[in-house]
Curated annotation (Swiss-Prot):
It comes from Hydrogenovibrio crunogenus (strain DSM 25203 / XCL-2). ATP binds at G358, P359, P360, G361, V362, G363, K364, T365. Keywords: ATP-binding, Cytoplasm, Hydrolase, Nucleotide-binding, Protease, Serine protease, Stress response. SUPFAM superfamilies: P-loop containing nucleoside triphosphate hydrolases, PUA domain-like, Ribosomal protein S5 domain 2-like. Its EC number is 3.4.21.53. Pfam families: AAA, Lon_C, Lon_lid, LON_substr_bdg. This is Lon protease 1. GO terms for cellular component: cytoplasm. InterPro entries: AAA+_ATPase, ATPase_AAA_core, Lon_bac, Lon_bac/euk-typ, Lon_lid, Lon_proteolytic, Lon_Prtase, Lon_prtase_N. Belongs to the peptidase S16 family.
Amino acid sequence: MDIDQIEFKTNVFVLALRDVVVFPGMVVPLFVGRPKSMNALNAAMKEDKQIFLVTQKNATEETPTIDNLYQTGVMANILQLLKLPDGTLKVLVEGVKRFELLALNDEENFLTGDIQQVESDEQLDNDGVVLVRTIQERFQDYAALKKKIPSEVLKSVQKITDPNRLVDTISANLKLGIEEKQTLLEILTINDRLEHILKTIETEIDLLESEQRINSRVKKKMDQTQRNFYLNTKLQAIHEELGDSSEDGVSEFTRLKEQIEQAGMTKDALKVAEDELKKLKMMSPQSPEANIIRTYIEWLVSIPWKKRSRVSKDLNKAQTILDKQHYGLEKVKERIIEYLAVQKRVNKMKGPILCLVGPPGVGKTSLARSIAEATNRKYVRMSLGGVRDEAEIRGHRKTYLGALPGRVIQKMKTAGTRNPLFLLDEIDKMARDLRGDPASALLEVLDPEQNKAFNDHYLEVDYDLSDVMFVATSNSMDIPEALLDRMEIIDLAGYTENEKLNIATQHLLPREIKEHGLKQGELEVPSDTILKIIQTYTREAGVRLLDQSLAKICRKSLKEIVTNEAKAPITVTPDTLDKYLGVAKYRFGLADETNQIGQVAGLAWTRVGGDLLRIEATAMPGKGKNTSTGQLGSVMQESTQAAMSVIRSRSKELGLPDDFYEKQDVHLHFPEGAIKKDGPSAGIAICTAIASVLTQIPVRSDVAMTGEITLRGEVLPIGGLKEKLLAAARGGIKTVLIPYENVRDLAEISDEVKEGLDIHPVQWIDEVFKIALESFPNVENDEISAISMKDAEMGKLVANKQSTKEIQKKSPKRH
């Protein structure tokens, strides 16, 4: 029987549908997998190929009851039935008429039911005719927005004249929920159905237009590089459309606001932070600019604005800490104690800016750490070696991609307090290039009048550095003058043998034993062994190589104990030292055993301390040509020319013929030619070497000298006296000649350095010849100084620096 002729029918095969509603006139493919549903289809195919389709209320129920099925369904024709490889069925059905389910029979193999055709009012009034036309137009608008409705469906909708067929076709092509579609299926009055479908279309059009607005806004905010953030930005735009914002955004904004309020910023910084926070609130969290502003605010709140360490004012405690961790260095310790003493009386004072100048290994960096502990300050270190970009100090503008504050602000954040001890390590190793001069940028940091308003390029707000205690370290005075002027220079010259011995015994050896896991009593290194290491295995101003040598002894001793090559305790004697450190690298006492013609020991200052400078001269028949070799700088070459002029002016006193310079060539050589040499302080040594080779009088091998020479033969003062005296002592020199005006410097040099040295101040080159040469021919000037460290007059000169007219001269020191 044709479905159109059925009004009531019993025992109709029932197919329960999940998540789909079939309308009359629809051709729908269905996938069927439940056994009873497949049996019902197979049975219907054998009979009249008709089946009743009804939707489940709860799609998860496997065996539905009549209570779980909607009352209204569709009687359909089975057009095609296919069996799939997995045993399930694919069926193509066409909905024909709406029927009402009256009863449901759950038989053994399938479901059957009693159904009755639904009678509906199909009479259209005038409003209904208008509704049909409006629905067709609005559906066309919907299709234009949706852009997924097939053109065949659009043409079909425009040609439909049956209002029920129109509603069914449109309902099938709208993206609606199951309940909404079922409602449209169940409405009986045609006018009500038309009004309902029109309202549904209008709602869908509004949603599509809102989505288009959201998409348009999102695309405007995005550029090509941010396509990966599209979905997140779209979600944010949806929240904005609803007048809401994400919970994460609210919590982040609140957190930043609280941090700004608690940071204790200055008024200017607070205003900038609040303005930036307002900008951040108006932005999408995923936009690149929002990340820049967020990072900027986090930097502002993370640096210390008001938190301070409580500076210790206990002078005894500070002295104890400094003495415990460092041997000697009395001038530095005294300066720190003076600073603490002033702080005891004055609440607010400018932080001192100290510069520790000395060769490597004398303990500059470790001393800064001890000062921080003694004053109870946080310790931060910034290495300036090789820094050549101004932005390293002041930072980059925050508009640059990946910009950060300069290292000064970064280290202040690390310190966590606004009054740490800030170590500027290797300040003399800074360079400069096209990107700027970092030394000039440091002027603002180290100037007490300016650093209370230090302006980092990234922060762009003033930050107060006036409470910071700056300590710089340097190997030399080769620092820009403007920077040098802002620092208090404290000279750390090299250690004496006795100081090195004490440092090794009290600090280095116990530390190395502990770090290498040796137990107490397993290794003994007597003082005479350490002294031999100092004399024959190291030649340095500091103690770094000494520390490495002791570490090597500890390693080898531990290996012997662990491998049972030796039993503890192991005692390293001077005789067994080569077993642990190999053959001695240096010969203690560099002075020659015999006096030599034309060979003089000069004294030089280097960045790593003092050193002996060997000078050789030889003369040969020629035409008066003077040659200098040994990688000499321009200043030293000029010194050789001045020295030759001095010799020529004193040819009579030296017993030389007037035309000696026309018949002899003189060659000056400075051994270790791979090392560059420069400076004026070798003037008197060069003069002595030339005088010796021309007169054939040997130079005393136990004499070393330093001093600049003038054309009149006057000896001018030099710098680095302590380092040079230490070098003389290390080289086994007994007698040292120094410029007369350097006598005043002896007062600041410890007696330990001066012990064992016979120091002679000299004013004129004739005095040098008198002492350095074995003999002095034709001496006409008896006013040669015979002052030495053994004379009582030396004590008077040192005690009363202004006692003679010569010492009152203010000649500048020269290196």
